[in-house]
Amino acid sequence: MSGNPVHPVNRVFVIGVGPGTADYLTPVARACIEGCDLLLGSPRLTRLFPQESRPLDFRGDPPASVKYILENRSRQKIGVLVSGDPGLYSFLGVISRYLPPEDYEVMPGISSVQLAFARLKESWADALILSLHGRQETDLARKVAAHPKVAILTDPSHPPQAIARALLAHGLKGREFIICQDLSYPEERIVRTTLEEAAQLPLSGSLLVIIQEKAP
């Protein structure tokens, strides 16, 4: 029989690494990572593990990291590390557009949203979850006004103070504004304040915001 040898294709693993420190990495996710030859992810995540790694690259169509996976998965077991849980605003959405379901596995993780509500000792079953991390939300004020509890993933381009100012500019008042900073890290801090006060706070770091109606 002639022709080139056929190499089996390794499944790609999309792995939720949790909200920050390795303390919140699940045992199943850790075992999956240990079985990978190469990890794709942000330096904040890949530096937690000894394997060879590459940063995620979203450029191009398909994105450069997807192209790398397609070209190398026959000879490498590749793990894609995402913060929190893969099902919540992660690179999983990109992977699912280019790979059939049988070609990848998803390892769930603990999201920063879960940890934030755990810290507050509140349910998040009724929360609307939005992300401004690397994206725009053109209808933010209407969505916040329509829901009694909203969690927002932020990034440096959309810090909590800018979110508070935008909501105030649309006339939204009377909401509690909770800033969860660097969750799971030693410097973790949670600030419960108002929209008006939050608009003046100079904050940076890994931040999540929860906006909810004040208790009567």
Question: Which residues does each predicted region cover?
Answer:
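Class I S-adenosyl-L-methionine
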Residues: 1-107, 114-115, 198, 207
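A contiguous loop/helix-start segment that scaffolds small-molecule binding in enzyme catalytic cores
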Residues: 10-14, 27, 78, 146-216
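Alpha-helix N-cap/loop-to-helix initiation residues
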Residues: 22, 88, 137, 159-160
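Short, conserved loop/helix-junction motifs that constitute active-site signature segments
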Residues: 32-35, 99, 144, 168-173
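Generic secondary-structure signature for well-ordered alpha-helical cores
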Residues: 38-41, 74, 122, 168-173, ...
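Short gly/pro/ser/thr-enriched loop/turn and capping motifs at secondary-structure boundaries
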Residues: 46-48, 111-115, 159-160, 184-187
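A short acidic, often aromatic-flanked loop/helix-cap motif at beta-alpha or helix-coil junctions
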Residues: 60-67, 112, 135-138, 184-187
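Class I SAM-dependent methyltransferase SAM-binding "motif I" and its flanking Rossmann-like core
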Residues: 87-148, 192, 196, 200, ...
